[in-house]
Amino acid sequence: MDEVAPGLLVGTMSDAEDESLLRRCGVDAVVSLTYDDPDTGAVARVDAPMTDGPRNEYEAFAAAAETVVERREAGQRVLVHCSAGASRSPAVAAAAMARLTDRGLDEAFEQVLARRSEVDPHDALVRRAATFVTEGSE
């Protein structure tokens, strides 16, 4: 699990199920992008399942990213996770970060990559992120 921006963490399914790790990192909410149900213990979990790759639907992506934005605006420390923490969760985190900070999506992705080496989002998710950021600036 890596903190890619203040209060915004990206991780794996294993991270989401490690209640001790979640507590040590001060995580208030877990946004789960998988179709599995991780046991986050006492930490609040928001299910926002979405597929990886070209079959990903924009509505699912936008709902997940908007959930992260809302939780961060409420001052919560949020872990966004998918299976490996390499494609879906970094893309959603970068989109939320771009929306929260009014910075460009490229800069947000660069920051995520600088803080988490296992980042390789599918091109379709990068496109969904760009649409989310663009729609938020209108």
Predicted regions and their residues:
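A phosphate-binding catalytic loop at a beta-strand-loop-alpha-helix junction
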Residues: 76-92
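Cys-dependent protein tyrosine phosphatase-like superfamily
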Residues: 1-77, 93-138
